[in-house]
Amino acid sequence: MPPLPLRLSALVLALGLSACDDAPRFTKAEPGEARSGGKTTVRKTDQNAFSLPSANLPPSRRVDFSVGNSFFRNPWVIAPSTTTARDGLGPLFNTNACQNCHIKDGRGHPPEPDASNAVSMLVRLSIPDAPAYAQVIERLGVVPEPVYGGQFQDMAIPGVVPEGKVRVDYTPVLVRFKDGTEVELRKPSLNITQLGYGPMHPDTRFSARVAPPMIGL
């Protein structure tokens, strides 16, 4: 194919660029954006907004919501107890109530360096897979750490030794943008200390997980 004349090439380029500029301009809200949940959208915007039932939940179902919400909010206790509906805590655990991790039914957060525990963040444990673990991997997806299992539990009921302590340290990292603006970020470093049941597998893998939002619970 012979090369296009210079003027024709410029015209094709201009048309191509104008076509690229046909993308929609989101300068104002689209229909429905103000009620992203449709008929379930609630009007509250305060710290309790995630803890409310759907706006279209009929009154006859509000009792069911309240009962479920109480189980999510109230602490579990050691068995035996008169609170039989919520007993059975421990012997090892990460926290004694769902909402301790899913704060106000929202997202959790990593612990601060001086925190006494890692509530709202947990640590998953695994070791490298091998043919001998084929059935375990098929069932669980990973191979749990042999002593501490698949999830590190840093709390325990009285008389039981917790599995250890979870601590996160932070190193300041300075980041500079192209316009010269500088911001200081924090690089986290996970530390597992005071192991209560002996050393871990030397090739243990750690995965810190912050509790996700559980809106409406």
Give the residues covered by each predicted segment.
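Hydrophobic alpha-helical targeting segments used for export or membrane insertion
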Residues: 11-13
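Bacterial N-terminal signal peptides that target proteins for export
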Residues: 1-9
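Extracytoplasmic redox metalloprotein regions
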Residues: 25-66, 70-217
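C-terminal motif of bacterial Sec signal peptides marking the signal peptidase cleavage site
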Residues: 17-19
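Bacterial signal peptide processing site
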Residues: 21-23
